[in-house]
């Protein structure tokens, strides 16, 4: 009799389910990355919840990106959720996110009545939130699955980490706020530049369903949020689907949509010199920390300038401030060939590049005092970093 009464109660509701708090909190955290407080569409300040036979799906969206996170009913023989009455609702994102994080018990019950009021209970706590009509929530982009390829999760995370830092922080040239992806048969080349530095990463890809060369520019802000969501399960593949104005990343229980930037990305190949007057091989960490120490004084300068002198394996890193003084230190390069080097550069730009190279040693190419500095990991031709010097000598 009690079971019949419960069934009648659930049937009178627009949506009813129980869900594990940790799974709900994780999904909310993911979709919140796509929710913006500044939007011309008020309903997009909320999170859409949809309960059905495949579990609970949460959606967050703004003008640039949309994220769907699904909590399956069961996963690896563990029960995540039970849906008593399928349905959907849109709840205020900030309040719902804070509330879920602070709920006291391991399980959460969500019931939505026909007035779109959501009763959320956990332990002895009960919240009643006014929801919004889910039918008013915009549909997510439709991306044709024909144009797609796959890449390992850990590799995708590395690509983002090693390129997105070099995108432009200003909207003067909007296309430079994104990373240019050039997809060819079996390979992907990713390039970012803000006109003062450049990063380029090439990788092999799998299951490329389009043999034609494709070029698309993904907003740096979208890739930064994607990197935060990707976990460290490197063996899992990410399916990447492209259209004329959208890109979709699918992995695990996540679907991550991003709009693409309009405009033609500049041809960066002409910025990369093919010859050099000098080159050296140094310990990556040693050079990084030497520049870091020199930057303590360089930070007082508007351009954060550090000077490098190199001749016959003798390396000197220095900087100075009229108010504070001068710092310099010396160390030995593993290899050095070519003309003596005297060059200045932004400490931040050089550290940004070196800090994203995982190799123990880097090979640095010098072309001239005002020509680009090229940095590559020793033994890896798939990564190239470029930093423009600053005129001081």
Task: Describe the predicted segments one by one.
Residues 1-393:
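Structural preference for solvent-exposed beta-strand-turn elements
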